[in-house]
C-alpha cells in the first residue's frame, strides 16, 4: 500500500505554513503520491483552493484541520492555563464530516476563542460523526501527558477520544522529525496501542515542501513573532525535517511499522468529500401577506409598474413580463424579494440608499420594486447584462448605503434571517513585493535605511512582482549583484511574495444562506465581525447568495447636506433635483469634482475637464470608458471630444473608438 500525507500545513496556516497551495499537490504528484490532506492550524481558509489544485493534478484531496482543543472547556479562560490549547487532527470522511468540521472550526472562533480558536471534548462528542481523528504532534494532549511522565493519563485520554469518535475513527499518530522527545513519545504511543488495540498511523508534520524551504518557514515564524534570525531565543523548529517527504523517506523512518504507513492509504480511501460548484443554495423569502413568493413578486412588479408608468409607452409592459418570466425560470424570485425588502426597510428608517449601480440598474422589474431609482427604459439599458437566460450566473445587485448606517441594514438582515444564516466575507492581505522586502529586511536585522533603499527600487504599481522589478530596474539588479546580503534579502522575499499574511473583512460582501452558514462554509471572527473563511469568489462558486452592502461616504455627505438645506427649506428633496442642471455640468467641466462619486480621482477629473459633459449620457460614457479594460483604446476619444454633445460621445464616437 502507498503512503499518504495526512498532516500538512499550507500557507493558510498564516505565518507558519510555507507550503504554497499551488505547489502542494504538484509536489505530491512529483513524489508519486495519489492523495494528500490539508490540515491547517485551527482554520479552513485554503480548503477550496487546495481541493481545486489537487483535482487539477489528479491527486485525491482530503479535507481536514488541526484543531485546538481547550485544556478544560471553551468556557474556561484563565491566563496561563486555558490559553495553552492542545492539537488534534480531524479529517473529513464524508459530507457529514465536512459539515461537522466546518461547525467545529466555526465554533472555535465564535464561542471558544481565547488566544486561539478552541473546541472542547463536549463539542467533539456532539459533532464527531463523519470525522477521523489523529492524536497530532507533540502539542497533542496524549504526547503532552507522555512527556510529563503521565502514561496512565495519556492512555485514558486516548481511550476517551476513541470513545468520542468511534472504532476505526481514532488513530495514535507517530512522527519522527529527529527530535529525541518525539522518539520517547512514540514509545509511549506504541505501548498504548499494544495495550488497547488502538490503530497507529505515521505522519510527517509538513510545514514546507522541501528541506531547503525550512529557511522560508523560519522567516515566517520570525515575522509572526516579531523576532530576528539572529535571536537565539526565537521560536523555531528544532530540525529541518518538517517537509513533504517521499514514501521511501517515511518507510525509512518507520521500518518496523509498515501497518502505520499503510493506514495512511486506508484512511485516504475512506475520505470522500466532493464539493459541488455553481449549484445555487438561495434562502427563501416569506411574503408578509402569506402568499407564495412568485405571487408576491408579480404583485410587487405590477403595483410598481402602475406607479412608475401611469401612462406606459408601448413595449414597456412587454419588457416587464419578459423580465418576470426570466427571473422566475432562473429561480431568482426570492433574490429580488430579499433585496427589495432590506432596501425598503432602510428607506423607512431614513437610511440613505443609492439609486442603483451596476448591471442591476438595467432591470425594469427592479425599478418597479424600488430596488433601483433609475428608469432603465429612459436610458435604453439592457436587462441581459444583469440576467441572461442563455448564460446562467448569479445576479448581483450593488446596493449602496450611508457609510455610517450600513451596519444597521446588516443587523436587520441578521434579525430577519437569523444570525447563523448571515455572515460577512473574509479577505486576505498578502505579502506584496515591497511588503515582503520590508518584512524580510526586519527579520534579517538589516537597517531601516538598507531595507528602504531596496524597497524604493520596486515600482509602486498594482500587481508588481519582484521578478518584474528586477527586470525593469537596473538599480535593483546592481544592488542584488553587488551585495550578498541584498541578494539574500531579495531571494528570501521572492520565496514569500504573494503568501497570505493576515485577514480582513470585505468592504461590501454579505452572505445569506438557507441553512446555517457553517453548513456550507466555516466561519471566523475578525474583531467583532463574523466572516466566512472562504473569499468572495469561492462563495459565489459554491452557489451561495452574496450581496453587496457598500457603505458610501458620498451618500453620507449628500444626506448631511440635505439635512442642512432643510433647516432653511423644509421641503427640499434630493430626488426632485433635475438631471440636466446646466450649472452642475459646468462645474464638472471645470474640474470641480471633489466629493462626486466615481469622478473624484485626478485622472477622471482631467477627463471631465477635457470632455465638458453636458448630460447624464456624457457622464455614462466617461465612467464606462475610464476603466482598466476599455481605457487604453478609448484614451484618444476622451482627449479629442472636448465640447461634443451627448449624441456624438455616447453613440457615434463610441462606435468609432471600438477596436
Language-model features: where?
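Alpha-helical scaffold/interaction cores of sigma-54-like transcription cofactors
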Residues: 1-659
Amino acid at each position: 500500500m502507498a503512503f499518504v500525507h495526512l498532516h500538512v500545513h499550507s500557507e493558510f496556516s498564516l505565518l507558519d505554513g510555507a507550503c504554497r497551495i499551488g505547489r502542494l499537490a504538484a509536489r505530491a504528484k512529483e513524489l508519486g503520491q495519489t492523495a494528500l490532506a490539508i490540515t491547517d492550524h485551527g482554520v479552513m481558509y485554503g480548503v477550496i483552493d487546495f481541493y481545486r489544485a489537487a483535482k487539477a493534478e489528479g491527486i485525491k484531496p482530503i479535507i481536514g484541520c488541526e484543531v485546538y482543543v481547550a485544556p478544560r472547556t471553551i468556557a474556561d479562560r484563565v491566563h496561563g492555563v486555558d490559553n495553552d490549547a492542545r492539537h488534534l487532527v480531524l479529517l473529513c470522511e464524508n459530507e457529514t464530516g465536512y459539515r461537522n468540521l466546518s461547525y467545529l472550526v466555526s465554533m472555535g472562533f465564535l464561542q471558544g476563542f481565547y488566544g486561539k480558536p478552541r473546541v472542547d471534548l463536549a463539542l467533539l462528542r456532539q459533532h464527531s460523526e463523519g470525522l477521523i481523528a489523529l492524536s497530532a504532534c507533540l502539542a497533542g494532549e496524549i504526547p503532552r501527558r507522555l512527556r510529563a511522565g503521565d502514561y496512565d493519563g495519556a492512555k485514558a485520554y486516548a481511550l476517551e477520544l476513541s470513545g468520542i469518535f468511534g472504532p476505526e475513527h481514532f488513530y495514535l499518530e507517530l512522527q519522527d522529525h529527529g527530535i529525541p522527545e518525539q522518539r520517547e513519545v512514540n514509545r509511549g504511543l506504541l505501548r498504548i496501542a499494544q495495550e488497547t488495540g488502538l490503530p497507529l498511523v505515521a505522519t510527517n508534520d509538513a510545514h514546507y515542501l522541501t528541506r531547503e524551504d525550512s529557511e522560508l518557514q523560519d522567516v515566517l515564524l520570525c515575522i509572526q513573532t516579531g523576532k530576528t534570525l539572529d535571536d537565539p531565543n526565537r521560536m523555531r523548529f528544532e530540525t529541518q525535517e518538517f517537509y513533504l517527504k517521499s514514501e521511501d523517506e517515511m518507510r525509512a523512518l518507520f521500518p518496523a511499522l509498515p501497518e502505520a504507513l499503510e493506514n495512511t492509504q486506508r484512511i485516504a480511501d475512506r475520505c470522500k468529500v466532493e464539493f459541488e460548484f455553481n449549484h445555487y443554495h438561495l434562502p427563501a423569502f416569506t411574503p408578509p401577506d402569506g402568499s407564495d413568493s412568485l405571487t408576491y413578486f408579480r404583485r410587487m412588479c405590477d403595483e410598481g409598474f402602475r406607479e412608475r408608468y401611469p401612462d406606459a409607452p408601448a413595449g414597456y409592459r412587454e419588457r416587464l413580463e419578459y423580465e418576470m418570466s426570466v427571473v422566475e425560470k432562473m429561480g431568482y424570485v426570492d433574490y429580488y424579494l430579499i433585496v427589495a425588502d432590506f432596501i425598503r426597510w432602510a428607506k423607512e428608517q431614513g437610511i440613505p440608499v443609492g439609486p442603483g449601480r451596476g448591471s442591476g440598474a438595467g432591470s425594469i422589474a427592479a425599478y418597479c420594486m424600488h430596488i433601483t431609482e433609475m428608469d432603465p427604459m429612459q436610458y435604453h439599458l439592457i436587462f441581459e447584462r444583469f440576467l441572461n437566460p442563455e448564460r446562467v450566473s448569479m445576479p448581483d445587485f450593488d446596493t449602496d448605503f450611508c457609510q455610517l448606517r450600513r451596519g444597521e441594514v446588516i443587523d436587520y438582515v441578521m434579525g430577519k434571517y437569523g444570525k447563523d444564516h448571515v455572515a460577512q466575507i473574509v479577505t486576505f492581505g498578502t505579502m506584496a513585493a515591497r511588503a515582503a522586502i520590508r518584512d524580510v529586511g526586519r527579520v534579517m536585522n538589516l537597517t531601516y535605511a538598507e531595507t528602504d533603499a531596496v524597497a524604493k527600487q520596486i515600482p509602486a504599481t498594482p500587481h508588481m512582482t519582484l521578478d518584474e522589478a528586477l527586470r525593469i530596474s537596473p538599480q535593483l539588479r546592481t544592488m542584488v549583484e553587488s551585495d550578498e546580503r541584498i541578494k539574500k534579502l531579495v531571494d528570501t522575499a521572492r520565496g514569500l511574495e504573494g503568501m497570505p499574511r493576515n485577514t480582513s473583512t470585505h468592504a461590501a460582501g454579505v452572505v445569506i444562506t438557507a441553512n446555517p452558514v457553517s453548513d456550507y462554509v466555516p466561519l471566523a471572527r475578525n474583531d467583532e465581525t463574523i466572516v466566512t473563511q472562504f473569499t468572495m469568489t469561492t462563495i459565489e462558486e459554491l452557489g451561495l447568495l452574496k450581496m453587496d452592502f457598500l457603505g458610501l461616504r458620498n451618500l453620507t455627505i449628500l444626506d448631511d447636506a440635505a439635512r442642512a438645506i432643510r433647516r432653511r427649506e423644509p421641503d427640499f428633496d434630493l430626488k426632485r433635483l433635475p438631471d440636466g442642471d446646466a450649472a452642475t455640468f459646468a462645474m464638472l467641466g471645470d474640474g470641480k469634482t471633489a466629493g462626486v462619486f466615481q469622478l473624484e480621482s485626478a485622472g477622471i477629473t482631467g477627463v471631465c475637464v477635457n470632455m465638458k459633459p453636458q448630460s447624464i449620457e456624457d457622464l455614462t460614457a466617461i465612467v464606462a470608458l475610464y476603466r482598466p479594460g476599455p481605457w487604453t483604446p478609448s484614451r484618444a476619444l476622451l482627449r479629442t471630444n472636448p465640447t461634443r454633445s451627448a449624441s456624438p460621445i455616447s453613440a457615434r464616437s463610441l462606435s468609432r473608438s471600438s477596436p
